[in-house]
């Protein structure tokens, strides 16, 4: 994989360039300095090799500010792991002392280095290019990230430096011919889907993918999300402080554990709109829900020393809304004294209907207690979500439930379930064919869902019952 790091002092347009290169808005862009605090990871798609772009925070080497020291450390780490470095400056300001200091740090790394003179919005701005060579970097390109100007030229220069070949395009005629052949092979001319009974239509899990499992860490500010990431990875990847909202962007972190790849999405804390005081915090809050939608599995981090808050319940309802498998991580467990873990979990389950259906793991990021169980819990949950429940097992389970608690008689009729299938895994859904929807009460539907949940260990997996009426077949 080719890795490209974007570096520079604050407010020169690094995040705008990052978004242009990745062709999506992954980094928050704002005129306020220090918007990007952690390393952000994106990818350039459509190249012949995998390409990762690393956006780093604005570097101020001499600052005594607590955050700036962390940002400087993160930026150097990003430069260290990259193959190609992009030093971004504001061409309207020329070469500043900060720009020169950063270049002095990067040149000894002996890596391909491009000086990207950003904010060259007009031809007049580009007239000052010759003045930039005094910084000691031979490769200089002018761009305007905000106007999408010369970005393609920059990408082509990166390809040249990295010796990346272009992808040969397949002729349109060959693609169309292949599509026509494939469509004819689906069914023979004598067959159609109507020839098959619904019972015979099989639903199987998708083929195994080598893509990383996307894990979103969700939670209100200051519950320890970044501490958990750093504890899992044994590396300080996310800036940590006791000020709520330290992480503003969603930070993508790729990690391999036991031959499996995980993409952790460390999110900004989600807050009620009343507490969102500026545009950056609002964008961060909205991105939390986007991270939920993007993830394969969500880890909801709560503070074990506090009661479940309305924020926590709101986040959990968002996870349920998006039908995402999830695990609740009760962090700061080391601060709980005199309470047995099973009693805490039991009491926590009783506080909210969604909590009662969730998987719960008590951990301590500060003491690194039970962190090793997070990976095994993720793997177990993913395996449960990925499997297909055999149709005979589904029907046997529901038949047993009907026998155990008979549905009530309504207008002289009783509910009958002819058959059921596990229809889809993402989202998890069962399809039931019954005699009449009017005979399935909400109470009894809840009973059937609880039966399926306990029988197939579907805790932490929101699922639905799709109900279809099927008239009794007469010969």
Swiss-Prot record:
InterPro entries on file: G_ENGA (IPR031166), GTP-bd (IPR006073), GTPase_Der (IPR016484), KH_dom-like (IPR032859), KH_dom-like_a/b (IPR015946), P-loop_NTPase (IPR027417), Small_GTP-bd (IPR005225)
GO biological process, alphabetically ordered: ribosome biogenesis
Keyword Cell membrane: no
Residues noted as binding GTP 1 in the record, renumbered to the chain: 8-15, 55-59, 118-121
Keywords annotated in UniProt: GTP-binding, Nucleotide-binding, Repeat, Ribosome biogenesis
Pfam families: KH_dom-like (PF14714), MMR_HSR1 (PF01926)
Domain EngA-type G: 2-166, 213-386
Record's keyword annotation contains DNA repair: no
GO terms, molecular function: GTP binding; ribosome binding
Domain KH-like: 387-471
Residues annotated for GTP 2 binding in this entry: 219-226, 266-270, 331-334
Lineage: superkingdom: Bacteria
General function of this protein: GTPase that plays an essential role in the late steps of ribosome biogenesis.
Family: Belongs to the TRAFAC class TrmE-Era-EngA-EngB-Septin-like GTPase superfamily. EngA (Der) GTPase family.
Subunit annotation: Associates with the 50S ribosomal subunit.
NCBIfam families, sorted: GTPase_EngA, small_GTP
Record-given protein name: GTPase Der
């Amino acid at each position: 994989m080719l890795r490209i790091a974007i570096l520079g002092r604050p407010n020169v347009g690094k995040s705008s360039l990052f978004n242009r290169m990745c062709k999506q808005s992954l980094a928050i862009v704002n005129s306020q300095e220090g918007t990007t605090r952690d390393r952000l990871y994106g990818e350039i798609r459509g190249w012949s090799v995998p390409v990762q772009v690393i956006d780093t925070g604005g570097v101020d080497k001499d600052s005594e500010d607590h955050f700036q020291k962390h940002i400087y450390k993160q930026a150097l780490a990003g430069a260290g792991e990259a193959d190609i470095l992009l030093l971004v400056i504001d061409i309207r300001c020329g070469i500043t002392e900060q720009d020169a200091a950063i270049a002095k740090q990067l040149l000894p790394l002996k890596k391909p280095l491009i000086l990207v003179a950003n904010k060259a919005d007009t031809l007049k701005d580009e007239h000052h290019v010759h003045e930039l060579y005094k910084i000691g970097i031979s490769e200089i390109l002018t761009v305007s990230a905000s106007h999408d100007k010369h970005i393609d030229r920059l990408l082509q220069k990166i390809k040249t430096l990295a010796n990346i070949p272009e992808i040969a395009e397949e002729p349109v005629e060959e693609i169309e011919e292949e599509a026509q052949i494939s469509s004819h092979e689906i069914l023979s001319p004598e067959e159609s889907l109507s020839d098959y009974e619904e019972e015979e239509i099989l639903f199987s899990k998708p083929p195994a993918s080598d893509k990383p499992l996307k894990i979103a860490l969700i939670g209100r500010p200051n519950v320890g999300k970044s501490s958990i990431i750093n504890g899992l990875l044994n590396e300080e990847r996310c800036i940590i402080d006791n000020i709520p909202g330290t992480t503003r962007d969603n930070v993508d972190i790729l990690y391999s554990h036991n031959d499996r790849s995980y993409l952790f999405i460390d999110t900004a804390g989600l807050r009620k709109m009343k507490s969102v005081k500026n545009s950056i915090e609002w964008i961060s809050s909205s991105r939390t829900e986007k991270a939920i939608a993007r993830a394969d599995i969500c880890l909801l981090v709560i503070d074990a020393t506090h009661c479940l808050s309305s924020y926590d319940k709101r986040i959990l309802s968002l996870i349920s809304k998006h039908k995402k498998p999830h695990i609740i991580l009760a962090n700061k467990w080391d601060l709980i004294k005199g309470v047995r873990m099973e009693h805490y979990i039991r009491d926590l389950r009783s506080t909210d209907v969604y909590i009662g259906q969730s998987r719960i793991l008590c951990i301590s990021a500060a003491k690194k207690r039970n962190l090793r169980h997070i990976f095994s819990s993720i793997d177990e949950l993913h395996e449960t979500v990925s499997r297909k429940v055999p149709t005979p097992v589904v029907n046997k389970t529901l038949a047993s439930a009907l026998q155990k608690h008979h549905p009530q008689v309504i207008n002289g009729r009783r509910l009958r379930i002819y058959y059921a299938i596990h229809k889809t895994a993402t989202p998890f859904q069962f399809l039931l064919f019954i005699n009449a929807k009017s005979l399935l009460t909400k109470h009894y539907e809840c009973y059937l869902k609880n039966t399926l949940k306990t029988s197939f260990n579907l805790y932490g997996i929101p699922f639905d019952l799709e109900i279809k009426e099927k008239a009794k077949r007469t010969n």
